[in-house]
Design a protein with these regions (language model features):
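N-terminal hydrophobic or amphipathic helices/low-complexity stretches enriched
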Residues: 1-9
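Cofactor-binding active-site loop characterized by glycine-rich and histidine/acidic residues
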Residues: 13-19, 23, 28-157
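Glycine-rich beta-alpha junction loops
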Residues: 33, 61-62, 168-170, 198, ...
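Short acidic, glycine/serine/threonine-rich loops at helix termini
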Residues: 67-69, 96, 146-148, 174-178, ...
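Conserved thiamine diphosphate
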Residues: 129-130, 176-205, 253-256
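A short alpha/beta connector and helix-capping loop motif
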Residues: 144-169, 214-220
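Glycine/aspartate-rich loop-and-adjacent alpha/beta segment that forms the canonical ThDP
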Residues: 199, 203-257
Length: 257
C-alpha cells in the first residue's frame, strides 16, 4: 500500500507545531495509521465524503493528525493550515465545533467522544444509515467513568455498528498500568487486537467485520511513531524546532520508502 498519505500527514503535523508552537506531536503521530485506514476504508466504498460526519476523535489532543488528513482531503486549505493555533483561527489545539467546516463534534475533555459516538450511532441505525460510526479513544480515557458507562450501554445496544479504535500508545502507563484494564475489555466486549501502525491489518479487520455488531479494536501503537526519539514522555507536549522538524522529516521519508 502506498505510504505517501501517512508521510504527508506527519510532515503537516510537524509544520503546524513549528508554526503554532502548540500541539501534541507524538500523540498525533500514534493515530496517523488508524485515521488513514478509516479514510481508505470509506474511500474504497465510495463513501469518503462521509468521513467527517461519521468520525469522532475522542482524544482531542491528537487533532493535528486529523487536520493533516482533512487537508489532504481538501477540507482544509493550505492557508488555513498555516494559521493553526493562531489568534482568530478556528483550527485550535483540540477538536473544534464548526459544522460548516466539517467539524461536527468538539472534544478535549477526556472521555466525552465515546458516549457522543454511541448516541449518534444509535440514532443513525434507527434512521437506516448503514455507515459505521468510527471513534478513536486514547488509552488514558479508560480512567474516565463516562467511558465505562458507555461501554455498558454498548452491551445494551450491541448493533449500532460502532467501530471503537483504542490508541494504546502506553501513554497512560506512566501513571496507571492499563494491561489488566484491557484484559477486562476483551472479556466483556467483542474486541480485536492489531498493530496500530499496520494499515493492512486495520483495513482487514474493518473489511472482515462488516456487520452491525459493535466492535472494539485495540490498536497497539507507539507515541511519535516512527521517530524513536519521540517515544518517551518528554515529547508528550514538546515542540520541535524547525531544524528538528527537518531532521524528523528525513527520518520519516527514510522509514516509509
Amino acid at each position: 500500500m502506498n505510504n505517501q498519505l501517512q508521510i504527508n500527514i506527519r510532515r503537516k503535523i510537524l509544520q503546524m507545531v513549528v508554526n503554532s508552537r502548540e500541539g501534541h506531536v507524538a500523540s498525533s503521530f500514534s493515530i496517523t495509521e488508524i485515521l488513514t485506514a478509516i479514510y481508505h476504508y470509506l474511500d474504497e466504498q465510495g463513501r469518503a465524503d462521509q468521513f467527517a460526519n461519521h468520525f469522532i476523535l475522542s482524544k482531542g489532543h491528537g487533532v493535528y493528525a486529523l487536520y493533516g488528513l482533512m487537508s489532504e482531503m481538501g477540507l482544509i486549505t493550505d492557508e488555513e493550515l498555516a494559521q493553526v493555533g493562531q489568534y482568530g483561527s478556528y483550527l485550535i489545539g483540540h477538536v473544534p465545533v464548526k459544522p460548516e467546516r466539517s467539524f461536527y463534534v468538539g472534544t478535549g475533555s477526556l472521555g466525552q467522544g465515546l458516549p457522543m459516538a454511541l448516541g449518534r450511532a444509535y440514532v443513525r441505525r434507527q434512521s437506516g444509515d448503514t455507515t459505521p460510526e468510527f471513534v478513536i479513544v486514547g488509552d488514558g480515557e479508560f480512567n474516565e467513568g463516562s467511558v465505562w458507562e458507555t461501554l455498558m450501554l454498548m452491551q445494551k445496544f450491541p448493533h449500532c455498528k460502532m467501530r471503537v479504535f483504542v490508541d494504546n500508545n502506553m501513554s497512560s502507563t506512566r501513571a496507571i498500568p492499563m494491561t489488566k484494564v484491557f484484559d477486562a475489555v476483551k472479556l466483556g466486549w467483542p474486541t480485536l487486537e492489531v498493530d496500530g501502525h499496520n494499515m493492512e491489518q486495520i483495513l482487514q479487520v474493518l473489511k472482515e467485520n462488516n456487520t452491525d455488531e459493535n466492535l472494539i479494536i485495540l490498536c497497539n501503537t507507539k507515541k511519535g511513531f516512527p521517530l524513536k526519539a519521540m517515544n518517551n514522555p518528554v515529547w508528550h507536549h514538546r515542540m520541535p524546532t524547525q531544524e528538528e522538524a527537518d531532521a524528523f522529516n528525513l527520518e520519516i521519508e527514510e522509514f516509509f520508502k
